[in-house]
Amino acid sequence: MNKGLLHNKLIDWYEVNHRILPWRETDDPYKIWISEIILQQTRVAQGMEYYHRLITRFPDIQSLADAEEDEVLLYWQGLGYYSRARNLHKAAQLMKNHEIFHLSNVECLKLKDEEIFAALKSMPGVGDYTAGAIASFAFDLPYPALDGNVYRVLSRLYDCEIAFDTTQGKKHFRQLAEELLDREHPRLFNSAIMELGALHCVPTAPDCHTCPLNTWCKALANNTVELLPVRKPRPKVRDRYLEYTIYITPERTTLIHQRKGNDIWKHLWEFVETTSVDFKNDNIDNLRGNQLPAALQGENSTQHYTTLHHSTQPQAISLTHVLSHQKLHARFVIKNVPELPEIPDTLVVSLSDLDNYAFSRLTLRAIEFLAQR
């Protein structure tokens, strides 16, 4: 393999075809770090909006570190995988007391590459890939950046049948990426190979005959492009049943509480959870009635509601919402009450103030229904 020619072909393609993205227009490590955390589990189109939101509200390490976690979660609301937001906040609090994160890029380049990489990797939520991406994009250091797009390009380029999301696979692909890396132009090379995977070497039906790397692509030669990359078997999605009560007073106040423990949606707010119940054998059809307006229906969520004849009697909203490892079946029972019950660890809030708190996407759909009542 003529790596020099491959590098040139790839970079030439990138110069003509790349997208204009805000984090590519800067070498600010903070902004690049924010973008990389967002893009860990989020597509660029959705991530762009959140990048601008976060950078506008938290323009530097100090402002992010000094914020309350609740506010960080609120600005993250809707992106999912909320541990990313919590780790972002924890990392900022560590960074503000860490000398290396207050140096200019020029001053950082006086340090050893390994020092910069180690400092980055020591932060919560930052692994090898994210540390390598920041080191490369902010400081132009010779570290590979491995995301899903790069795994796909490498697996096809080398016709590699090792599952990239296993311990063995991660080690193997990192070695391939380090060997292929253009060490004279790591920032440009990493941007180019990521963009190739995002725009050209796509999961299905890629246009291999116009690919700049087709001369070297072993999967194309062996007719295995559509079989790659290989992933480890995904765990079975399990059903989980939840029930909540939404108390509403004549003054339009309700009760919410903050989730604790290490379960899903840690530190997000929700209505009073009656219990984690198995109501799959209930006559849920009695709760369904009319379908919610299309505006309230998400790609991975189906929603139904029923309105009973008397406003003092309960109403119920039934929703399903799919996470990566769980299918949630939730029922929100709306109870109009003269006054709120006393329930430990709950907060009394006005319905009009709910947008000041961070909720899961599932609960947000219930809130959207409430707003239309």
Report residues per predicted region:
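Intrinsically disordered, low-complexity, charged terminal extensions of DNA damage-control enzymes
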Residues: M1-R19, E25, A198-R373
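Catalytic cores of DNA base-excision repair glycosylases
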Residues: N2-G4, N8-K9, W13-H209, L213-W216, ...
